[in-house]
Amino acid sequence: MPTINQLVRQGRKKSVKKTNTPALKGCPQKRGVCVRVYTTTPKKPNSALRKVARVRLTNGIEVTSYIPGIGHNLQEHSVVMIRGGRVKDLPGVRYHVIRGTLDTLGVSDRRQGRSKYGAKKPSK
């Protein structure tokens, strides 16, 4: 416990929160170009082929981002929008591609949770 005199001399240190998405530089989303689109396998208890893309952002930083949903149309040189949000079983993947914006198509035949996958409302 510091004395009053110690607090007067030095004050309290502000604890600085480390950001989980440093490449976004405080922005909610960023645009980028796909450098490589590939699949990778998740960590130990899980098994799958997760679709990911290496994206070079407009600020020059290159990040790995996850492509959510079933099926995608992304390839090299596709322009995508990314947001923050990690994938727990893929180490080093801290960003998500936003479906339904720029070159990324929304998920077709999606009925629930459509807004997260850029899917239009199905006609009756």
Swiss-Prot record:
Is Ribosomal protein included in the keywords of this UniProt record? yes
The record, for Pfam families, names:
Ribosom_S12_S23
PROSITE patterns, per this entry? Answer: RIBOSOMAL_S12
Is the keyword Chaperone in the record? no
Entry-annotated residues carrying 3-methylthioaspartic acid: 89
Q: Which UniProt keywords apply?
A: Methylation, Ribonucleoprotein, Ribosomal protein, RNA-binding, rRNA-binding, tRNA-binding
Q: How does it assemble?
A: Part of the 30S ribosomal subunit. Contacts proteins S8 and S17. May interact with IF1 in the 30S initiation complex.
**HAMAP family, A to Z:** Ribosomal_uS12_B (MF_00403_B)
Protein's name according to its UniProt entry: Small ribosomal subunit protein uS12
Name the gene: rpsL
